[in-house]
Amino acid sequence: MGIKEKEIELETLKREIAQAEASLEQDFIKHMVDKTNEKVEDLFFSDKPEFYKFVFTEQNNYLREKLTDKVSKAMDLSDEIQRDKDAEEIEKDKQAFLNKHPEVDFNELLEFYEEELPKRIKTQIDKLEGAAFFEAILDYFNAINAREEEPKKESKEEYSSLPKEALGNGVSGVGYANNENIMTRY
């Protein structure tokens, strides 16, 4: 059932609840008159606590049947409509984000959000709405990936500019035999 149909059903329930509340006392009186028989009348004269217990039980059952179930259903339906609207809004934002960034693997981004993003940052991102939410995740994702790739590039460049001896290849210990090494002089 779509959101519009649920909203129509919710409005119908609200009208039914308003009508039931307006005529509740009169309808309950009619219900009790119909429900009253000799046994109930005898209870009134012989065992007043049992009589009132019966009346209140009937009243609670009547309220549940006529009002409480409808109110509960209306509240559930209202919550369901809100969840559907939120999900629809998130889907719209997701599509706008994917249209803006078609190169992004959304599943990878979602996995990053769920598993790798620190809780402190996740809390801040959760406060954002719309496409800004997805943009913030992408920014952190790109920042983390750039940080991981930088050391690899730097280390390769760093080693390639050094002479072979500094890299540790081909260094001979013979040149330092006459205590030329500062660490072994004393």
From Swiss-Prot:
Highest rank taxon of the organism: Viruses
Coiled coil recorded as keyword: yes
Keywords for the protein's UniProt record, in alphabetical order: Coiled coil
Coiled-coil segments: 2-30, 63-85
Protein name (Swiss-Prot/TrEMBL): Coiled-coil domain-containing protein ORF13
Organism per entry: Helicobacter pylori bacteriophage KHP30
Organism lineage: Viruses, Duplodnaviria, Heunggongvirae, Uroviricota, Caudoviricetes
